[in-house]
């Protein structure tokens, strides 16, 4: 990556292993993550409630959602930041990483 023609080191994002993914769809627009944005992900397999995570669904598909906890069901679930979409409950949550930054095109 470059900012004003200067290389941008991965260390700019902090400590850890990072990768970028391109957001697809409108499920996270309420968190200002829009279709086509680049999302910087810190690779890790744990996350805190409230963080935006990349997780595998029961169908082994990656999804970018907010991690929340349902006290009644005593389980974690994935929450899209779009009121028109439903929460995703998975039997075995597999976190792949945590979103740390969003890069938008101007």
Model-identified regions with their sequence ranges:
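Acidic/glycine-rich C-terminal interaction modules and beta/coil loop segments
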Residues: 4-5, 11-106
């Amino acid at each position: 990556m470059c900012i004003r023609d200067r290389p941008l080191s991965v260390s700019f994002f902090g400590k850890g292993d990072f990768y970028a993914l391109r957001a697809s769809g409108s499920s996270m627009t309420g968190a200002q993550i829009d279709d086509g944005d680049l999302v910087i992900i810190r690779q890790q397999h744990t996350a805190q409630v409230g963080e935006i995570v990349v997780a595998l669904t029961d169908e082994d598909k990656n999804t970018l959602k907010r991690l929340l906890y349902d006290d009644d069901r005593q389980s974690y679930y994935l929450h899209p930041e779009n009121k028109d979409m439903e929460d995703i409950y998975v039997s075995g949550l597999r976190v792949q990483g945590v979103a740390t930054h969003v890069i938008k095109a101007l």
